[in-house]
Amino acid sequence: MATAGASSFEDEIMESDIELEGEAVEPDNDPPQKMGDPSVEVSDEKRDQAQLCKNKGVDAFSEGKLDEAIEHLTEAIVLNPTSAIAYATRAVIFVKSKKPNAAIRDADAALKINPDSAKGYKSRGMAKAMLGKWEEAAQDLRMAAKLDYDEEIGAELKKVEPNVLKIEEHRKKYERLRKERDIKKAEMEKQRKHAEEVSAASAALKDGDVIAIHSSSELDTKLKAASSLSRLVVLYFTAAWCGPCRFIGPVCKSLAEKHRNVVFLKVDIDELNSVAYRWNVSSVPSFFFVRNGKEIDKVVGADKNGLERKVAQHGSS
């Protein structure tokens, strides 16, 4: 049995082999066979001599004398390097000699001269099958069958095509596994980034405390962090000269300690009057309830009971 290695994927997708039919041969690494010079003008006399040499080669081949047949065909090719049939015939003999690389070189030469050479496609397909290049072999053999079908081509296709089918199924399987792996990796990366964002957001917030805000950008950062954690924000506007604010301040601290999932942010309107203007603060203390960056409720004045009720209501939702 011959095997073909599958693509290797990272993680859980491991290398796998396909069990294929047929025996591959070791590639022949002999020096390239003698080829003719296609630029040479061939006389009628040389064509006739080449034909005689080709006939001798075919006779020797029919008698099983492969080396002698190759010698005669080589002589024919040198005499008439424009003969596609001479190259294709020598390619067939190289296939029988189990020299697939030499056969492929001759088949290529034959097909360059005559792109419709059935024997060229046939010998190249058989040679590629010997090397385990099943898909390329099938392509050449199918073309040979289309041009001039014979039983040998049909028999070779019956050996090659099941392997091609196995390779295609194997490729589809591992393409599916690769896609599943990529989806899994993307999801893991998404989760990792989310975890980093949550960690960074959590670090930016102080659970159980009222956070004093000293700049507009700091407020935006805290609001964004709270949104990424889907947490309620109580935005508390105060002022140093405000008596009711001094009364409600300890209440805010107590609520922050009690509702640790709620983010309490404190803004002094004199320090950050642009922020107060942006939020349309008309009096202090004022409390804006914010979720995902949007105001959902509001308490104006030092209404302890109202504030506690609103925090409990929105903080638990």
Curated annotation (Swiss-Prot):
Site (Contributes to redox potential value): G243, P244
Domain Thioredoxin residue range list: 189-316
Pfam families cross-referenced by the UniProt entry: Thioredoxin (PF00085), TPR_11 (PF13414)
Disulfide links within the chain: C242-C245
Annotated GO biological process: chaperone cofactor-dependent protein refolding; response to stress
Active site per database record: C242, C245
UniProt region (Disordered), positions on chain: 1-48
Gene Ontology CC annotations of this record: histone deacetylase complex
TPR repeats: 50-83, 85-117, 119-151
Comp. bias regions, Acidic residues: 9-29
Key words of the record: Disulfide bond, Electron transport, Redox-active center, Repeat, TPR repeat, Transport
TM region positions: none
GO molecular function ontology, one term from the record: Hsp70 protein binding
Family under the similarity heading: Belongs to the thioredoxin family.
Function: Probable thiol-disulfide oxidoreductase that may participate in various redox reactions and act as chaperone under heat shock. May interact with HSP70 proteins through the TPR repeats.
Xref: PANTHER family: HSC70-INTERACTING PROTEIN, TPR REPEAT-CONTAINING THIOREDOXIN TDX
Protein name: TPR repeat-containing thioredoxin TDX
Source organism (scientific name): Oryza sativa subsp. japonica
Species lineage: Eukaryota, Viridiplantae, Streptophyta, Embryophyta, Tracheophyta
